[in-house]
Design a protein with these regions (language model features):
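Conserved Rossmann-fold NAD(P)-dependent oxidoreductase catalytic core, especially the SDR/UDP-sugar
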Residues: 86, 92-158, 177, 185
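N-terminal Rossmann NAD(P)H-binding glycine-rich loop of SDR-like oxidoreductase domains
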Residues: 2-30
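NAD(P)H-binding glycine-rich loop region in Rossmannoid oxidoreductase-like domains
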Residues: 36-104
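Structural signature of the Rossmann-like NAD(P)-dependent dehydrogenase/reductase core
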Residues: 8-9, 82, 123-126, 185-191
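NAD(P)-dependent short-chain dehydrogenase/reductase
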Residues: 176-228
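Active-site helix of classical SDR
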Residues: 161
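Conserved cofactor-binding/catalytic machinery of classical short-chain dehydrogenase/reductase
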Residues: 66, 105-108, 164-165, 229
């Protein structure tokens, strides 16, 4: 595949791990960023992934709040898939624990992309929380142009985090000069179910399955889920 290098942020997470696995199965060169390269729960399952002959895997430590480590991780990349973010929806300190990782982290990632001068494609992993307002009329169709602009730190910190990060990447991309334009895609997953690659993946969306098995939730959930196979 030549000199192409795909950087996957948040590679130890549930979505990030599956992205890395998929890329390696296609023979891609992958640089996977994790918070702690010495934590077996974060890296062991990545090291055990099958790598096709033309591919390679490099695991590096990166802190979203440390711009220098983000800059280093992006060096030489041709593609960036940004999946790193806080996945909790409630906290005693929602600004620091939920909003800041998405907002500051995303700002550092796009700054590093600009500095690299090599990135051609960027995928930003957002969420339906970014396009789902707190209130909407019955029958309305939520789209990538329907934003959670009414999300607040007190009532919906996760939605605020995802909405804010979405606005950051869109504004950044819109303001790039034509000569600097890179291809950008934002995706908006809802709840994500599938095989866990690490014990750490049993939280988040997969915790719903565990709660159903333990009969802690009704079989018919009081929520809306967009089903995509």
């Amino acid at each position: 595949m030549g000199a192409d290098l795909v950087v996957v942020t948040g590679a130890s997470g549930y979505i990030g791990s599956h992205v890395v696995s998929n890329l390696l199965s296609k023979g891609k060169n992958v640089r996977a960023t994790v918070r702690d390269v010495n934590d077996p729960e974060r890296v062991e399952h990545l090291r055990n992934l099958k790598i096709e002959e033309t591919g390679s895997l490099e695991i590096v430590e990166m802190d979203l709040f440390d711009s220098k480590s983000v800059d280093s991780a992006m060096t030489g990349a041709t593609d960036v898939i940004h999946t790193a973010a806080a996945v909790i929806v409630r906290s005693k300190n929602p600004q620091a624990k939920i909003v800041d990782p998405s907002v500051i982290g995303t700002k550092n990632v796009i700054s590093a992309i600009e500095k690299s001068g090599t990135v051609e494609r960027f995928v930003h992993t957002s969420s339906t929380a970014a396009i789902r307002p707190e209130k909407w009329e019955n029958g309305v169709t939520l789209t990538a142009k329907t934003f959670a602009s009414d999300a607040t730190l007190e009532e919906n910190p996760y939605g605020l985090a995802k909405y804010s990060a979405e606005m950051i990447v869109r504004d950044w991309h819109d303001n790039l000069e034509d000569s600097e334009k890179i291809k950008m895609i934002t995706i908006h997953p809802c709840m994500v179910f599938g095989p866990p690659l690490s014990s750490r993946h049993l939280s988040g969306s997969l915790s719903v399955i565990m709660m159903l098995m333990r009969r802690e939730l009704p079989l018919i959930l009081p929520m809306q889920i967009n089903i995509v196979d």
